Every structure is written in structure tokens, then in C-alpha cells.
Amino acid sequence: MSYSIVRVSKVKSGTNTTGIQKHVQRENNNYENEDIDHSKTYLNYDLVNANKQNFNNLIDEKIEQNYTGKRKIRTDAIKHIDGLITSDNDFFDNQTPEDTKQFFEYAKEFLEQEYGKDNLLYATVHMDEKTPHMHYGVVPITDDGRLSAKEVVGNKKALTAFQDRFNEHVKQRGYDLERGQSRQVTNAKHEQISQYKQKTEYHKQEYERESQKTDHIKQKNDKLMQEYQKSLNTLKKPINVPYEQETEKVGGLFSKEIQETGNVVISQKDFNEFQKQIKAAQDISEDYEYIKSGRALDDKDKEIREKDDLLNKAVERIENADDNFNQLYENAKPLKENIEIALKLLKILLKELERVLGRNTFAERVNKLTEDEPKLNGLAGNLDKKMNPELYSEQEQQQEQQKNQKRDRGMHL
């Protein structure tokens, strides 16, 4: 039995929106995700937009068109909700490309009913990964025109109801799909996902720090520009310094005739000020031209952009890993159920065999068959404890229960 899978999450900044845009529209040159088959990327398609979009600009346009709230939108308001719709490979293996597209068309129909057609940003189907899936995005505008991700997404209970409605929608369209169990229902709070989220949050914070550095650099640059301009203005002002013309006697020793030498005499204090101004002019001229030309800011912006690209790639790698892990987990659910059924059947058969042979003969045969296989022997012992708990001490039962709990947690990771 295949499953209907729908996920939704809030996107908390324009930077993350840009990262999602690059992943959804395949804008990066290289991807760490090995599941992407670039030879099939041309098969991807968007059911909303004919051409690639700038998601942040598109969000602003949607808000301009559909927001009717009276309050000014906060700068930290969540303007973007991102989600994913898919099933498992067993389902898609039995679908032609046209059938797959029709499935996602029905999924888009559901999204339009839930969020409003005008609020849908994109519905991009990826056919170049192992399992076809659709990324979708919406602006969280309520029916009465307010921007509220909290109200549109809702709490855990609302998310569960949302997943129920999606499963019912696809069933009504003729798809025999079971509802994928939510992580809230199964309590599958995986340590790896938590680590991915922590790393994602780290990169978000790292970007914020770099952005603050950029703002600080720009402010410092503006301040330096003002100081340099002030120094230049000072240098351009006419200098009114008291001075005397230097003279010398001409003629004989007793002559009183004097003439100007062409030099001037100023005070030591004024001379020192001249030296300071000359030094200031020398110091600022090269730096001023560097800043005035824009090269300083361009160089710093280039450095910040390079760091920004690295952070976006890191965030994308983490989000891809998160998606892949969730997909693997969903695909593993039927296997886990089959294993549990097989174990139940095995216990029934072994119990019947023990009844027919007698416990002692049964134990001897099992020990003989597994004496060279320690793991099999241990498994047989564990099964026996489950089939005949009354034959074991309370302490042994508690130890076995603890082992089972650890094993179950391992199966959820």
C-alpha cells in the first residue's frame, strides 16, 4: 500500500526564500544532493509559472495585490510557506509521466482550495530525483486579507487535519493511497533531523552576522567619506596665516638699502600646522580615491556575496538532507510493518513447533542448529523469552524490555 505525503513549513527570512528558490528552480551550478540526475532536469515543470521567478519579488507582488489589513506589516513577519507533496516509488512506478502530472494537478487543485489560488506562488514538480515530488509555496494571507502564517498553518492538530483532508482529496480523485503518518502521531522525533535543523539555524545566524558586518562596513565607509570630505574641504579653504617678507641688505657694510628675497617668514606654530595639513592630504588622497571610485565598497560587497553563496549552499545541503531523510523514513514504514507481521508469524510457528516437539527437544534442536551462529542463537533466545515470559525471572524480563526499547528507538532513527 502506498501513501499520500504532504509537508508544510514556515520560511522565516528572505534569505531562506532565496535558498529555496535556487533549489526549486535549479539555479545553482553544482548540487551536493547526489539524488539529482541533471540529465533529467529538463523534465521538471512548474504548474503555476511558465518561467522562472524571483520568489521574494513574487511574494511582495502577492501581498501588494491581496493584503487588505490595516496594520503595517512587521519586518519580521513570515511571508512565505513552503511545502512538499509526494508518495512512494511503488506508486510512481505504476504511473506514466502523464499520470504523474495529473496527480500533481489534483494536488495543486487541493492547494488552491486550502490557501486560495491567488496566494499560490509556485508548484514545481521535480522529475530529476529518485522519487517525483512537488515543491509548493504560498503567501499566508487569510480569507479576510490579513498576513498570518500562524493562522494559515495552525498548530499540530491543524496540520494533522490538513494531512487528513489531502488524503481524502486524492482518494476522491481515484487514488488508493493511505494517509502518511505524521511525526506527531508516531513520535518519530529523529535525532538526525534535530541536528539538521540546528545546523540550518546556525547558518541562518551566520548569515545574519555577516549581514550585520556588511551594514557596519557601509556605515563605517559613510563616516570615512564624511571625514575625508571634511578634510578635503579644509585643505581647499584659503589659508590666512600672518607672515612677513624676508629681506636682506644690499650694498656695502654700512648701506641701509634692503630688498625682498622672495621668501616669507611664518611662525613655528603656523609651520607645524602646514606640515599637518600636508601629511593629511598625503594620507587621505589615495584612500579617498579608492573609496570615491566605489572600488572599496565593490570589493567588500564581493566578499560578502561569496560568503552568502557559501551559506546558501550549506543551507541547501542541509534542507536536501532533511528532505531525503524524511523520504527514506516514509518509504521505510511499510518495511517496518512487514517485519513486525513476519515476527508475529514466526513466533506463532515456533510456539506450535515447541508444542509438537516438547520444550526440551525443541530447545536442543534450536541450540544445535544455531551453535555456530551466535547472533541467531541470541535471536532465538529473545524470541523464547517473548513466547514464554513466565519461565524467566522478573529481572531478566526488565532487561529484555529495556533492550527492546533501545531497539525500537533505533528503528525510528
UniProtKB/Swiss-Prot annotation:
Keyword check for DNA-binding: yes
UniProt region (Disordered), positions on chain: 179-218, 374-413
Coiled coil: none
Keyword annotations of the record: DNA-binding, Plasmid
Residue ranges with Basic and acidic residues bias: 188-218, 403-413
Organism: Mammaliicoccus lentus (Staphylococcus lentus)
GO molecular function annotation: DNA binding
Residue sites binding DNA per the record: 45, 115
The name this protein goes by in its record: Plasmid recombination enzyme type 3
CDD domains: MobM_relaxase (cd17242)
Domain of life according to the entry: Bacteria
Cited function: The interaction of the RSA site and the PRE protein may not only serves a function in plasmid maintenance, but may also contributes to the distribution of small antibiotic resistance plasmids among Gram-positive bacteria.
NCBIfam families in the cross-refs: MobV
GO biological process: DNA recombination
Misc: Contains conserved positively charged amino acids probably involved in the binding of the pre protein to the RSA site.
Family: Belongs to the plasmid mobilization pre family.
